Structure formats: C-alpha cells, structure tokens
C-alpha cells in the first residue's frame, strides 16, 4: 500500500446531526477528549477567556450565545485521523448544515432519549438520504428519565424510514442506570459516571448468564433478560452492507454528560464507517487514491479574524495530497494559484498546514474570488456535483436608507449571498431587491454586516412571497410562453438563474399543474 493509500485508509470524516439541545455540544467535547484534542472537556472554552466557546467567532454569535458557524476539528484516535464537522444547532442555519453534509462520508445522529425523533433531526436525515450517507445513532441522556427504548427504535424506523439495529441495550435509566449490555459481544459495560475530563476505565462483566451479572443487575435481572429476548426477536441485526448503503443504523445508548457510551460510537465510526469515498463530478468519478489533487469548497466563512477582514473557504479534499506551496487550478476562473498558507482547524485555533489527504478539510484564504461549489484541481477541468442551494423559506424587500448607495448595496448583498446563507433576487418587473433566507436571524446578520463591512444601512419590508422555485424546461418555446404569462412573479437570482417567486402555496400548486413541462425545483446546484 502506498503512503497516500495508507493515509486515506486512516481517515474518517463525519458530521454530528441532531435537534438543538439533544446534547450535540457535549458529545463533541467528549469526542475531542478521546482524541486528546482538548485536555478538559466540559466546555470547549477559549484558551484566552472563559466566556465563549472557541467556535463562536462572529460578534453576533457572541451576543446571542449560539453557534452560527460550522466548526471543523481534526484529532487522532486509535491510529486513525478523525475529521469531525460540527454543524450549527440553531434552526436558522440549516442551509449551512445541509451543505456541510455534502463534505462528509458518514454522520452521527444524536437523539435525546426523553424526546426521541424531533423535527430538525427529520430534516437533516432527509438530506443524508439524498446521498445514502451511513448513519450511526446515539440515544443520549440515559442519566435522566427516557422513553421506552423499544418505542424509540420503532420511532426511528417509522419516522426516519431506516432500519435500527441496537448494538448496546440500556440496563435501566436515570437513578437505576447500571450500564449497557453489548448484544453481539455478550458482555455488560458497567456505568460509572465520569464528569468533565474524567475518563474512567470501563468495568466489563463477561456474559449475561453469570453470577457477576446477576449480582450487578440485582432484582432487575429477570425482567432485563425477558426484555432482551423481545428485543432480539423483534429488532434487526447489524449488517455492514445495509449500513454503508444508508439503509440501516447501528444504535448505541449512553450519556454524554456522564462520559459514558461516546467511545462506543467513535469505535463504530472507526470500525464500520467508510474511509473517504469516490466523489462524482460532472465529467467522471474521482477516486480518493488518485495521485492528482482535487477538492471542492462547501462553505465560506467571512471574518473569522476581525483583525483582518478575511474569508476562509472550507475545502474537502477528494483526491491526491495537499502540500504547502503547491500549485492548483481554480477551475471556474480557469486560473492557477500557488497555495502556501492552507489552514487546519481546531475551531478558531488555526494552524498552517504542511500536508493533507483525501477526506481532510482545509481552509483557504479567500479574497472574494472563491464561491461555494468551486472545484480546485492540478489542471483538470472538473466540477463536483451535489452541493445544493435550497429555496429560502422567508423573504423581505430590501429598502436602502441612502438612495445614492445602491451600487454598494447590490455589491454587498451579492458578496454576502456568495457565502450561501442568504440569497438575493432581482424581480423582472421592478427595481426591487428581495432577500431570501432560511431563518429570521439571517436578516439581522446581513443588515449588521452591510453596515459594518460595506457602510450601507438598509431596512426590510414585508413582501408576499411564500417560496422560490428555480425554473428549467427542455422545450425552449414552452419556457418562453411560461415567461410571458408568469412575468409578474419571475426574478433572476444572484447567480443569474431564472426563479419563480410564488406568492402562496396554492399559487405554486396551480402553476405546477398548469405548466407540466416546466420544472419548478426547490434546490439548485452551485456552479
């Protein structure tokens, strides 16, 4: 095996998906602790202050105490290199989260044992399903009262449409939580709470049918054995092929706060989750062990460092090897660049990088020329597929306070839209500018950044737009006919694409019925 192939085989790149408050931040901390990336878990604190977690860079995040940005963290574990992409928990930032999921090979789904499957989890699983992403599941908070575990598995299967295969099974919960039983290994992992950075070596009891197990379970023993028979009769067994194809999820139980069960999940990622996979480009499929470097940008983060008005483009390496000072081609601009200052991440602690391999995430300094979806190669003209723009759910008309600054306003909105969290639309029939976003908070972010970075003050007005759909049609004549009839509701988006701004849900349904040859798409790819 070549050195490059060996490095690729070591990589595991995954994201954590969950509903806000299911315990994602705590799990992230415990995972980093396993890789010794932080010495004291129980809070990813900034090294310079105790007030803010390291991943909260932007002023607005600090003021509101939510993670708006996607953090990327790399750490070693069991002779592997783990790339963990943390996704924003706040509901307004789903588009950023969705695109992050295009850069990973697997995902860890965290569920609150007391609440089960929640709306955000469903939305994120829908995105994972588009790419058949393998999912490992962790049912968290067993140190509290949880719902019946069998009921939770049924809910995963019914709501998320994926088979659930329990690997561990909880022995009691809350004050009676005694640990988990490993179904295939026939052993008990005893629960001893470890808080903060304590990692207590787990005590193992071999075989459920043993005096030691009977003593540990006490009067719960008989009912637990009965429950297990039911579970083993009713549940799916783990199957590696079904897992890799996104049809089955192995399920683990534990408590991240009590530092119990998180290592089982990380072991599953190392043992079962795929190494970096081939990536589909418009031209061909790119394999990770190819010699030549390729990568695509899935996220742009502006102003990670307020001292320099910088933007960092986050790139997933798809093949080859990044070496400091190498030359790469920015395919969309057909321009060669020498990259000597790519970054690796521990949240906002950034370090310059000497080398990186397929599966790794690196940061490129971006002075406004890099866009989401851009491909970089060593010369080949490639464009990776599957990096989506989603139709916004909220719309506002932008009103300029100083009419003389309309040029700066357009420029600012266009540049901020390039980061992919908001989208800008220019109606065909008016001089209005309409801003679309997936959450209300984004409008505040844009207004404050226009003011700080572009010296433009704007206000928002309500507008009757229910949703946007990108328009395409194979029949040119039909498209022209549609454009003439629907002109009132048509706009051009920031990327120059024709868009239908539907005033109501009913209007959209009627238009889709009336114009069967026109495709009304809720997503479009970045090009």
Curated annotation (Swiss-Prot):
GO terms for biological process: regulation of translational termination. It holds the Pfam family RF3_C. InterPro entries: EF-G-like_DII, EFG_III/V, G_TR_CS, P-loop_NTPase, PrfC, RF3_C, RF3_dom_3_sf, RF3_GTP-bd. Residues 9-277 form the tr-type G domain. Keywords: Cytoplasm, GTP-binding, Nucleotide-binding, Protein biosynthesis. It is found in: Cytoplasm. GTP binds at residues 18-25, 86-90, 140-143. One of its GO terms (cellular component) is cytosol. GO terms for molecular function: GTP binding; GTPase activity; guanosine tetraphosphate binding; translation release factor activity, codon nonspecific; translation release factor activity, codon specific. PANTHER family: PEPTIDE CHAIN RELEASE FACTOR RF3. Belongs to the TRAFAC class translation factor GTPase superfamily. Classic translation factor GTPase family. PrfC subfamily. HAMAP family: Rel_fac_3. Increases the formation of ribosomal termination complexes and stimulates activities of RF-1 and RF-2. It binds guanine nucleotides and has strong preference for UGA stop codons. It may interact directly with the ribosome. The stimulation of RF-1 and RF-2 is significantly reduced by GTP and GDP, but not by GMP. This is Peptide chain release factor 3. It comes from Pseudomonas entomophila (strain L48). The lineage of its organism: Bacteria, Pseudomonadati, Pseudomonadota, Gammaproteobacteria, Pseudomonadales. The gene is prfC.
């Amino acid at each position: 095996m070549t050195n490059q192939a060996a490095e690729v085989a070591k990589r595991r790149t995954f994201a954590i998906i969950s509903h806000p408050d299911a315990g994602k931040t705590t799990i992230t901390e415990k995972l980093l602790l396993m890789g010794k990336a932080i010495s004291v878990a129980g809070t990813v604190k900034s090294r310079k202050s105790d007030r803010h977690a390291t991943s909260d860079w932007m002023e607005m995040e600090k003021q509101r105490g939510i993670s708006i940005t996607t953090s990327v963290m790399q750490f070693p574990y069991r002779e592997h290199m783990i790339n963990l992409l943390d996704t924003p928990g706040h509901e307004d930032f789903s588009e950023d989260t969705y695109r992050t999921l295009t850069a990973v090979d697997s995902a860890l789904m965290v569920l609150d044992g007391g609440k089960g499957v929640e709306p955000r989890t469903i939305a994120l699983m829908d995105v994972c399903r588009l790419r058949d992403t393998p999912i490992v599941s962790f049912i968290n908070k067993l140190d509290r009262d949880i719902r019946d575990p069998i009921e939770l598995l049924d809910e995963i299967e019914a709501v998320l449409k994926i088979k659930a295969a329990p690997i561990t099974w909880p022995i009691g919960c809350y004050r009676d939580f005694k640990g988990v039983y490993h179904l295939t290994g026939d052993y008990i992992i005893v629960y001893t709470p470890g808080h903060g950075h304590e990692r207590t070596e787990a005590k193992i009891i071999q075989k459920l049918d043993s005096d030691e197990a009977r003593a540990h379970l006490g009067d719960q023993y008989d009912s637990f054995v009965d429950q297990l028979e039911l579970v083993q009769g009713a549940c799916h067994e783990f199957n590696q092929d079904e897992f890799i194809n996104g049809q089955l999820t192995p399920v683990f139980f534990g408590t991240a706060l009590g530092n119990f069960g998180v290592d089982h999940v990380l072991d599953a990622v190392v043992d079962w989750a795929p190494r970096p996979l081939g990536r589909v480009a418009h031209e061909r499929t790119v394999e990770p062990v190819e010699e030549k470097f390729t990568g695509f940008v899935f996220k742009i983060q502006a102003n990670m460092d307020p001292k320099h008005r910088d933007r960092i483009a986050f790139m997933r390496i798809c093949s080859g090897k990044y070496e400091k000072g190498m030359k790469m081609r920015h395919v969309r601009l057909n321009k060669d660049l020498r990259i000597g200052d790519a970054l690796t991440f521990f949240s906002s602690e950034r370090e310059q990088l000497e080398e990186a391999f397929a599966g790794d995430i690196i940061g490129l300094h971006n002075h406004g020329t890099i866009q989401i979806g851009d491909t970089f190669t060593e010369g080949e003209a490639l464009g990776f597929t599957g990096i989506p723009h989603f139709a916004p759910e909220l719309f506002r008309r932008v009103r300029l306070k100083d009419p003389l600054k309309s040029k700066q306003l357009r420029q600012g909105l266009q540049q901020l839209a390039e980061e992919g969290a908001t989208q800008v639309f220019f109606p065909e029939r008016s001089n209005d500018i309409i801003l679309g976003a997936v959450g209300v908070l984004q409008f505040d972010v844009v207004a404050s950044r226009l003011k700080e970075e572009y010296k433009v003050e704007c206000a928002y007005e309500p507008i009757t737009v229910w949703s946007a759909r990108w328009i395409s049609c194979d029949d040119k004549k039909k498209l022209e006919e549609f454009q003439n009839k629907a002109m009132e509701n048509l706009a051009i988006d920031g990327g120059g694409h024709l868009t239908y701004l539907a005033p109501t849900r009913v209007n959209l349904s009627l238009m889709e019925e009336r114009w069967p040859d026109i495709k009304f798409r809720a997503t479009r790819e970045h090009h």
